[in-house]
Curated annotation (Swiss-Prot):
It is found in: Cytoplasm, Nucleoid. It comes from the Bacteria. Belongs to the MraZ family. Its main location: cytoplasm. The keyword Magnesium does not apply. PANTHER family: TRANSCRIPTIONAL REGULATOR MRAZ. Pfam families: MraZ. Gene3D superfamilies: Transcriptional regulator MraZ domain (3.40.1550.20). Forms oligomers. It comes from Shewanella frigidimarina (strain NCIMB 400). The keyword Cytoplasm applies. One of its GO terms (molecular function) is transcription cis-regulatory region binding. Residues 5-52, 81-124 form the SpoVT-AbrB domain. This is Transcriptional regulator MraZ.
Amino acid sequence: MFRGASAINMDAKGRIAIPARYRDALRVEHAGTVIMTVDIDAACLLIYPLHEWEQIEAKLKLLSDTDPLERSFKRKLLGHAQDCELDSHGRIVIPPALRSFASLEKKTMLVGLLNKFELWEESAWQQQMDDGNALIQSQDLASNERLAHFSL
């Protein structure tokens, strides 16, 4: 399970170091392999452990190749998907096309979302956090069926 947000600097070769607390699990449970792709509605990258990505692929297989929307959805996720291996220092290389998609330069945020990570350009992460906070404040959470009884 991945949780928390970590500020990570990307080096000149396009590598980021996965936080140490996740490295052993990724190596042991997922053979050090993660799959990186684009998000469908935000300028960030999604990073899935191999086992989690295989579940996504199974769902994508069920989508139509003849329905234009479903085909476009598959193309976006699968067309950008890249296998990435943790090196001996726990780093992964972010492919140039994916760096460009998410406008990644040096300062990034790696955000754990239980079964995957999101990778954001740092200022874009802050902006979406501000936007998300404003959205939460402006909404009646009780009107959302899944949030109505959510308690912390």
